[in-house]
Amino acid sequence: MAIPQKATVLVIGGGPGGSYSASALAREGIDTVVLEADVFPRYHIGESLVASIRPFLKFIDLDDTFVNYGFVRKNGAAFKLNNQKEAYTDFILEAGADTFAWNVVRSESDDLMFKHAAKSGAQTFDGVRVTSIEFTDDDDDDDNNTNRPVSASWKAKDGRTGSIEFDYLVDASGRAGITSTKYLKNRTFNNYLKNVASWGYWEGATPYGMGTPVEGQPFFEALQDGSGWVWFIPLHNNTTSIGIVMNQELSTQKKKLSTTTSSRAFYLESLAGARGISRLLDPTTATLTSDIKHASDWSYNASAYGSPYLRIVGDAGAFIDPYFSSGVHLAVSGGLSAAVSIAASIRGDCPEEAAWKWHSQGVANRYGRFLLVVLGATKQIRAGDRPVLNGVGDEGFDEAFMVIRPVIQGIADVQGKVPVQDVYDAVTFSTNVVQPAAEGKRDPGWVEKARGALSHDEKEVGSVLNNLAKAYKTTDVCEGLMARLERGHLGLKLVSEV
């Protein structure tokens, strides 16, 4: 099938965000084309999903495919932040509840989503990279004279080249973020979360929680020196993904002091700093069977996640340290809001200016909530046994994890799933943890700023929060609009219509 010369919507990128957006749009009968640079199936990291994935998949009729595929079922996750007992976030609070998620091999799960976009009616092409985007002045647009994207040039792996015109553009191009980095130039890095990641795949690892109700769930453990954390994620191909996320500056210092000479040796040396996970790697049975992979893990965000006739989705706009497995959630939730806002604009539910701003604000809110909880967890990890997330004298973090549960499980971003007050409480709690109020203005029992960890990083944390405050809003209602999630009528509606 030849790549068409014109489409109503062009989606750049066939990962979870792009494929989800394309599926939702195509199911509305909207002419949608997806151009993906890689050839599917392709490798990707980010293998643990959160509870919100289920309602998102159900909305595009993809949930049953995932249920029946054979991925490792994820009923929750355990987090060890210091020497206190680990916290556990339970996806299944009621017996028999259909709220579990999965650990996935991304080459397989992403391929399912990419193929589903085609089944839904989108025209999908892999091995085709978008090389440039053309913009033009839109005389009908009064939004600060922002130019409108109208066409894209592409090059296929087989050497073919061409261009495609479109009415709307969804940029789901991953960390490359072609529109954010090349045209809007609005990406900002968060130096406080400037990390590096290294990981590999093991066979024969002992499951976490053997003989307990949480047996086999993913486990995330802080390194003893507070320099980072380790993930332990069992997969259905009989391997366990084990990765180390470490502050880049501290990682560089450690390498200079280390006597190891290879990335594999440094990975194994660093892994020893996670004592709980190390105990799951019995040297007589557990074997590292892959090469060590590496990636920069720098968190970033954008000042806006779109412009007239443009929507930015997933890693193309923002990325957060993956401690709470937020990547796929932010991608698919952004993919849905891109589809909702484009459908609304096409159907005349609201002006295009209101539609793109609704999408952009929603992405900023979802990113902001996850950023706050990740900052809080990072602060606790670096603080060691000093209380940050919990109160002085408290054992464990159960109370804190119950408060932030709507955010770390993603359900705060599923319309109608969580009371607004619960989301507000999670955000307020996380804000107070990251940047405590002055003495006498916070609840007693929580550690004060003067006693908190990372005093040398307070300026950097403040910079991150100031950047967040410019975009974050406490409500997901923007421009007086909210999503209308009805197949055949996807779009936006006035809050007064609810």
Curated annotation (Swiss-Prot):
Alphabetical list of InterPro entries matching this protein: FAD-bd, FAD/NAD-bd_sf, Flavin-dep_Halogenase_NPB
Record's keyword annotation contains ATP-binding: no
GO function terms (MF aspect): catalytic activity; FAD binding; flavin-dependent halogenase activity; monooxygenase activity
Catalytic activity: ochratoxin B + FADH2 + chloride + O2 = ochratoxin A + FAD + 2 H2O
Broad class of enzyme this protein falls into: oxidoreductase
Coiled-coil region: none
Full protein name: Flavin-dependent halogenase otaD
